[in-house]
From Swiss-Prot:
The keyword Mitochondrion applies. The gene is HIBADH. It is an enzyme of class 1 (oxidoreductase). The modification N6-succinyllysine is found at residues 60, 76, 95, 141, 149, 238, 242, 297, 321. Pathway: Amino-acid degradation; L-valine degradation. This is 3-hydroxyisobutyrate dehydrogenase, mitochondrial. It comes from Pongo abelii.
Length: 336
């Protein structure tokens, strides 16, 4: 690892690790020494669009893996690479004392941890359990309580950056949990991400992720609307995107993940909206934001509208397409 843990912005209390930060020589040696000394097997549960490349980056850093996925075919390439595949989350917990889970929903996470063959059936005392799923903060807190009863440590560490960042190892991790355990989590998360941010107690990582994804959905819908309007007004989409990205309307949805086919290469819109982050998952995350807003009495007018739009998309056949397919949805649905 090319960076050490630092305390930045003392006034704000923000604590994070980034590859862009250069450590003092002594701390670099300490991090490298700890990393080499502790490359014992790591459990990884959930090998979907995000989990697959995340697990591969752990392999690249020399960590042996204990693998489980509910779909056996997802494990095959890891098994072919010499990694150990087991038949349940409980079996992962029996063989590894550091486990990362990357699952689609709160229900999946509850089953993986507390189910009949869940992690908690065989978890060892002192184990570190890191959940990188995006789930309800309240569920994270309940799982943490159950894990603590077993003498283990639970941290929520959802991610941002999408499949591209997962492949390149440049994810951002938002981490909630006991601060004293952050360094141990960072050792693993730093293999998969370029920014690892400590957010506070268990559940705060999920809170940060929910806020981020709500804003992402709103900005994607806004980008899709602006691009659609400009095209219908006679503008070339590539030219319009270029103008937006050198102007005040620039955002990640316009300059990195543009939703219009033909504007960018290497994004889902260039591949009939296949891969990436599904509209179903975005609708799920917006539902989490809606629930959190209701419980905290926080107005989210645009967030609520975004939730309605993505729910409509899923009902009209877009559920398996990337969330940027909202551009296609708006192009085809003219009666709002």
């Amino acid at each position: 690892m090319a960076a050490s843990l630092r305390l930045l912005g003392a006034a704000s209390g923000l604590r994070y690790w980034s590859r862009r930060l250069r450590p003092a020589a002594g701390s670099f040696a300490a991090v490298c020494s700890r990393s080499v000394a502790s490359k014992t097997p790591v459990g990884f549960i959930g090998l979907g669009n995000m989990g697959n490349p995340m697990a591969k980056n752990l392999m690249k850093h020399g960590y042996p893996l204990i693998i489980y996925d509910v779909f056996p075919d997802a494990c095959k390439e890891f098994q072919d690479a010499g990694e150990q595949v087991v038949s349940s989350p409980a079996d992962v917990a029996e063989k590894a004392d550091r486990i990362i889970t990357m699952l689609p929903t709160s229900i999946n996470a509850i089953e993986a941890y507390s189910g009949a063959n869940g992690i908690l059936k065989k978890v060892k005392k002192g184990s570190l359990l890191i959940d990188s799923s995006t789930i309800d903060p309240a569920v994270s807190k309940e799982l943490a309580k159950e894990v603590e009863k077993m003498g283990a440590v639970f941290m929520d560490a959802p991610v941002s950056g999408g499949v591209g960042a997962a492949r390149s190892g440049n994810l951002t991790f938002m981490v909630g949990g006991v601060e004293d355990e952050f360094a141990a989590a960072q050792e693993l998360l730093g293999c998969m991400g370029s920014n690892v941010v400590y957010c506070g107690a268990v559940g705060t990582g999920q809170a940060a992720k929910i806020c981020n994804n709500m804003l992402l959905a709103i900005s994607m819908i806004g980008t899709a609307e602006a691009m659609n309007l400009g095209i219908r007004l006679g503008l070339d989409p590539k030219l319009l995107a270029k103008i937006l990205n050198m102007s005040s309307g620039r955002c990640w949805s316009s300059d990195t993940y543009n939703p219009v086919p033909g504007v960018m290469d290497g994004v889902p819109s260039a591949n009939n909206y296949q891969g990436g982050f599904g509209a179903t998952l975005m609708a799920k995350d917006l539902g989490l934001a809606q629930d959190s807003a209701t419980s905290t009495k926080s107005p989210i007018l645009l967030g609520s509208l975004a939730h309605q739009i993505y729910r409509m998309m899923c009902a009209k056949g877009y559920s398996k397409k990337d969330f940027s397919s909202v551009f296609q949805f708006l192009r085809e649905e003219e009666t709002f």
